[in-house]
Amino acid sequence: MNLFLKKLLKNDATGGVVLIVAAAFAMFLANNDSTRHAYQAMLTLPVQFRFGALDINKDLLLWINDALMALFFLMIGLEVKRELMMGSLKGRERAMFPLIAALGGMLAPGLIYAAFNHQDAQAIHGWAIPTATDIAFALGILALLGSRVPAALKMFLMALAVIDDLGAIVIIALFYTSELSLISLTVAAASIAVLAVLNGCGVRKTSVYLAVGMVLWVAVLKSGVHATLAGVIVGLFIPLKKQEGHSPAIELAHGLHPWVSWLILPLFAFANAGISLSGVSLNGLFSAVPLGITLGLFIGKPLGITLICWLAVKLKIAALPENTRLIDIAAVGVLCGIGFTMSIFIASLAFDGAHEELVTLAKLGILSGSVISALVGYTLLRVKLR
């Protein structure tokens, strides 16, 4: 491999561009009369996996979202663990910071949405739609700024978005899931216990953790909870400490990085960004549902994150990540308003069985709020990091 190609593959900004191009191409295909049906048919292509009594039969889209994205979340779990143990989030006060930020970033958007829709018995079910952050697209936009982004700021966004996603998974399980499989949840809990024992006994063979992780992934998938959660959990248990110059967590993260940046995230963007705008009108943007979502994402996210972080620092409950200021946190908070795929998923659950118009209006609000947040967040950070 020549030097230019090596540099290109290691360039985070280039990976961000590929993600945006994949998303734009998906939007084109989904809104073009001659390609719309072929695009949808490809994503709904059934893919079956059988191994003994195990039978998993899902559409291609769900394999990308549940299986490939579990590897992305595995890498995120590894990166967050490293920062918690030896990086910018080390120490109780700094570790608490993204947790508190995520809570504020979920509370404020939900309240803003509720303020616009509390009188509509159907629309109020969508209160959780603007609470989500699409970690893949948020990191993709941040990656466009390349090496200018301080590592501490990137890790803060990563940790905040992971906690945000975990919060969204809990909300979905509590408010939007009718049935959870207790047997599968028990198997998942047992798998986590095995991972903890392996880590406690000092087992350093990565393949052992990944094997248990596959059992955990299947159990979480079958339980009715979002399967990507398994990736984060496995990443947090893989040993980090070096022994004879060998760190399983760091080496696995480095190995996953090019696959995630150049294959998994672009595929995710291509499969999920194809939102059909058929039946959408700009007049509808100013109705209560899309307005509540747009303002919840663009205003509520950064406002909630910034205010609660300011309060936590003042009360000495948490501490800012090293080499960052509150204005940096506010700018990253704007990027957290990119709800996109996770928000669309919650909208489909919230308005399941309701009038299709609510789903269309929700998508309009999600798209407008996410695009505005991406553009403004990128601009703010670019100006600040100049």
From Swiss-Prot:
Main location: membrane
Single Gene Ontology BP annotation: regulation of pH
Location within or outside the cell: Cell inner membrane
HAMAP family, alphabetized: NhaA
Function: Na(+)/H(+) antiporter that extrudes sodium in exchange for external protons.
Similarity section: Belongs to the NhaA Na(+)/H(+) (TC 2.A.33) antiporter family.
Protein name per Swiss-Prot or TrEMBL: Na(+)/H(+) antiporter NhaA
Organism expressing this protein natively: Erwinia tasmaniensis (strain DSM 17950 / CFBP 7177 / CIP 109463 / NCPPB 4357 / Et1/99)
Record lineage: Bacteria, Pseudomonadati, Pseudomonadota, Gammaproteobacteria, Enterobacterales
Gene this chain is encoded by: nhaA
